[in-house]
Amino acid sequence: MTRKYFGTDGVRGKVGDAPITPDFVMRLGHAAGKVLAHGARTGQGKPTVLIGKDTRISGYMLEAALEAGFTSAGVHVLLTGPLPTPGIAYLTRALRLSAGVVISASHNPYYDNGIKFFSASGDKLPDAVEAAIEAALDEPMVCAPSDDLGRARRIDDAAGRYIEFCKSTFPYEQDLHGLKLVVDCAHGAAYHIAPPVFHELGADVVAIGNQPNGRNINAGYGATAPEKLIEAVKANGADLGLAFDGDADRLQVVDADGRLYNGDELLYLIVRDRQAAGQAVPGAVGTLMTNMAVELALKREGVDFVRAKVGDRYVLEELNKRKWTLGGEGSGHLLCLDRHSTGDGIVSALQVLGALRRSGKTLAQLLDGVKLFPQTLINVRVQKGFDWQTHAGLQAARAAVEPELEGRGRVLIRASGTEPVVRVMVEAEQAEMAERAARKLADALGA
């Protein structure tokens, strides 16, 4: 089913351009109130939603618009102010609310923003529910009678509740005493959350990217720009650096030598730590982009590996379908469903730190069994509407290349969703092998 407004992670765009305008967001709140809240079980007595945001300047405007939309539909609203996306998921479930809403564009620049929803159980909405909200958007917006309007109020203990939840996912018998951490909050929603979490567990914390001004979120700091973190780890003689993005649902880690570890490697580490603790891990879920070295390493440890479409929502769907608990993406979205219902950068960092504490080893030592395969990516510009899947020359080249890579590499070809480009990606044990195969495939397309 084609969706008009919802993408892979809610509704997102440039502030001031449709659909991220105050009038549309108010109508979105009203439509979502009708679909999500009415009839939902709630501990508040009346349908009630939780609204949180990151630190973008536009969050004030969009928060007010959502508040108007929900209350006009007869739904109560609780406002948290700036809080990581996974914190909203947790509190929605913990407070027994009808739904949760986050105003954030995650790792995007400050001039973008978005709206995403969580169900009463703290899960991302399935496609069918998003389609129902879109259908409700096409209906006239009819305000509830005055006696039925919702109320809005701020809750003051949201940050403290979420900090305690994060700490509860770290083994009680362990602590972080003697560990020096640099924590990069991307000037985003974790600025007042992440440093206290690690400090209260005993770490010596150096916080950077923790002075949001509404316009500096993700700007040169955070999981998508780790250079400042690498510098700070070295300058402070820290043991580790942790980088979150603007809404703190993704994680990148830097060791004392300045080496950066991505989500693929961290997923492997968490799986192996669960096994070391005596837990059965039947399988893990990655995406089409997960490095093949991780897949092979997991299979050597008896762990099945499945690839989902790119996007943490699809990783989550695959995990739920198989009743597995661990999955993630190279970008740093990591899912530990035995700890939280959604991807959580802070909780993921605590799982990594727990593995280090339990093993007494360094990151490099724990990941010695995973040497990421080199990747070669070639973007081939094509005519609009070009069907690469039936291109005879490409199919012939692929048939020649793939047997050479079997067990030592793989091919991924996909069309860009935003421009007339076909992306040819090859990864292999040796860089030369990947480059040679990618060039052969790109040449077949006429690059």
UniProtKB/Swiss-Prot annotation:
This is Phosphoglucosamine mutase. Catalyzes the conversion of glucosamine-6-phosphate to glucosamine-1-phosphate. Binds 1 Mg(2+) ion per subunit. It holds the Pfam family PGM_PMM_II. Keywords: Isomerase, Magnesium, Metal-binding, Phosphoprotein. It catalyses: alpha-D-glucosamine 1-phosphate = D-glucosamine 6-phosphate. It comes from the Bacteria. InterPro entries: A-D-PHexomutase_a/b/a-I, A-D-PHexomutase_a/b/a-I/II/III, A-D-PHexomutase_a/b/a-II, A-D-PHexomutase_a/b/a-III, A-D-PHexomutase_C, A-D-PHexomutase_C_sf, A-D-PHexomutase_CS, Alpha-D-phosphohexomutase_SF. The active site is at 106 (phosphoserine intermediate). GO terms for cellular component: cytosol. PROSITE patterns: PGM_PMM (PS00710). Its cofactor is Mg(2+). One of its GO terms (biological process) is peptidoglycan biosynthetic process. Belongs to the phosphohexose mutase family. The modification Phosphoserine is found at residue 106. Activated by phosphorylation. Gene3D superfamilies: Alpha-D-Glucose-1,6-Bisphosphate, subunit A, domain 3, Alpha-D-phosphohexomutase, C-terminal domain. Mg(2+) binds at residues 106, 245, 247, 249. It is an enzyme of class 5 (isomerase). Its EC number is 5.4.2.10.
